[in-house]
UniProtKB/Swiss-Prot annotation:
Coiled-coil features, chain-numbered ranges: none
UniProt keyword terms in alphabetical order: Cytoplasm, Methyltransferase, S-adenosyl-L-methionine, Transferase
Family classification: Belongs to the methyltransferase superfamily. PrmA family.
Molecular function GO terms recorded: protein-lysine N-methyltransferase activity
Entry's EC annotation: 2.1.1.-
Main location: cytoplasm
Binding site for S-adenosyl-L-methionine: 152, 173, 195, 234
Protein name: Ribosomal protein L11 methyltransferase
Length: 300
């Protein structure tokens, strides 16, 4: 079976947002390169370990997305471009790629990730740097959420500070299950994870078993009735806006909600939609992304 690479060249200010949108919409992997590499205009690499980059992408960037055979490159790119607010779909090329052991190639790039005050996300082939910390064992896979993306990190930091033992938590758009697993390890009970992708649901179940975290997972139609003390949703801004009424209704009066997958420039628009139901504001910003957090107003 052959895969396809979608290759897009575009300006720096759109490269990271486009790569994130492509991942959310189903790309197997996405990388950003210097489109001027091996030319006189080539710029130094960014993001070397231990360094804080002065910019998030090269001036002239090349985004390369690996797609499964069932994805139509033009359709996926158009959806991603629309999601990040581009006026038109960028020009692109498509290359055929023979199947390789992508999992092993990807694993070689992952190291333990420290998050917040006491969290470590550790691949199974590594030992935890601090065994006494709050350790989540998680291997990269097709489901979104390894702790490396700013939105996942923001939600994890918020959960670490917010979850109290015995509180009920709903993770809507659970991906790999990383947020649901963390909530359980912070003492939440019960914890429910919901995703539209059956593969993500299965991945999340396996990750929970590996972490000995009892979480109930399912597709949207399996979402239990009733309200939760905490609802967290790390998805894209458009789905968040469309599901505002439903997500807010899952929060108990006085309960809390956290939303991410939202670019800083999208924060006001998303907050305005949720303001009908909850008192909400930007909790924290990181690398151009925000986590919105709020409290559902008490019923009268």
């Amino acid at each position: 079976m052959s895969y396809r690479e979608l290759v897009v060249e575009l300006a720096r200010e759109h490269a990271e947002a486009l790569s994130d949108a492509l991942l959310e919409l189903g790309a197997l992997s996405v990388s950003v390169e210097d489109a001027d590499a091996d030319t006189p205009d080539e710029q130094p690499l960014f993001g070397e370990p231990g360094l804080v980059p002065e910019r998030t992408a090269w001036q002239h960037s090349r985004v390369i997305a690996l797609l499964s055979p069932d994805h139509e490159p033009a359709v996926l790119l158009a959806a991603a471009a629309n999601e990040i607010g581009l006026d038109a779909t960028p020009k692109f090329d498509v290359r055929e790629v023979e199947e390789q052991d992508w999992v092993r190639l990807t694993q070689s790039q992952f190291e333990p990730i420290p998050i917040g005050e006491r969290i470590w996300v550790v691949p199974s082939w590594h030992d935890a740097p601090d065994p006494d910390a709050l350790v989540l064992e998680l291997d990269p896979g097709l489901a979104f959420g390894t702790g490396s993306h700013p939105t996942t990190r923001l939600c994890m930091e918020w959960l670490e500070q917010s979850v109290q033992p015995g509180q009920s938590v709903l993770d809507y758009g659970c991906g790999s299950g990383i947020l649901a697993i963390l909530a359980k390890k912070c003492g939440a009970n019960p914890v429910v994870g919901i995703d539209i992708d059956p593969q993500a649901v299965e991945s999340a179940r396996q990750n929970s078993e590996r972490n000995r975290a009892e979480v109930t997972y399912g597709l949207p139609d399996a979402c239990p009735a009733g309200e939760f003390d905490i609802v967290v949703a790390n998805i894209l801004s458009n789905p968040l806006k469309l599901m505002a009424s439903m997500l807010a209704s899952k929060v108990k009066p006085g309960g809390r909600i956290a939303l991410s997958g939202v670019l800083a420039r999208q924060a006001d628009e998303v907050a305005a939609v949720y303001a009908r139901y909850v008192d909400i504001s930007v909790w924290r910003e990181h690398e151009g992304w925000v986590c919105l957090a709020g409290t559902r107003r008490e019923s009268h």
